[in-house]
Amino acid sequence: MNYYRKRLSPLPPNQPIDYKDTELLRKFITERGKILPRRITGLTAKQQRDLTTAVKRSRLVALLPFVNKEI
């Protein structure tokens, strides 16, 4: 009999996701610069929305690249 394990979020529930924290944001984007989906990151829905907003804001102020051209 299989029992489903509760998936734990990789971030604490109270931890804010800041657009200036590029080390944290880089954990959730691919080598090409795409944002990883929620099923891979394991974040909650609210954390994923906040992460997406933070990554997009970080790209606009040039802390993260839009596309990583290194192949």
From Swiss-Prot:
Q: What is this protein called?
A: Small ribosomal subunit protein bS18
In Gene Ontology terms, what is one molecular function of this protein?
small ribosomal subunit rRNA binding
| InterPro entries assigned | Ribosomal_bS18, Ribosomal_bS18_CS, Ribosomal_bS18_sf
Highest taxon above the source species: Bacteria
Q: Which GO terms describe its cellular component?
A: cytosolic small ribosomal subunit
GO BP annotations, alphabetical order: translation
User: Gene of origin?
Assistant: rpsR
The job of this chain, per UniProt, is described as:
Binds as a heterodimer with protein bS6 to the central domain of the 16S rRNA, where it helps stabilize the platform of the 30S subunit.
Keywords assigned: Ribonucleoprotein, Ribosomal protein, RNA-binding, rRNA-binding
What does the similarity note say? Answer: Belongs to the bacterial ribosomal protein bS18 family.
Pfam annotation, one family: Ribosomal_S18
* Organism for this UniProt entry: Synechocystis sp. (strain ATCC 27184 / PCC 6803 / Kazusa)
Its quaternary organisation is:
Part of the 30S ribosomal subunit. Forms a tight heterodimer with protein bS6.
Q: What residue intervals traverse the membrane?
A: none
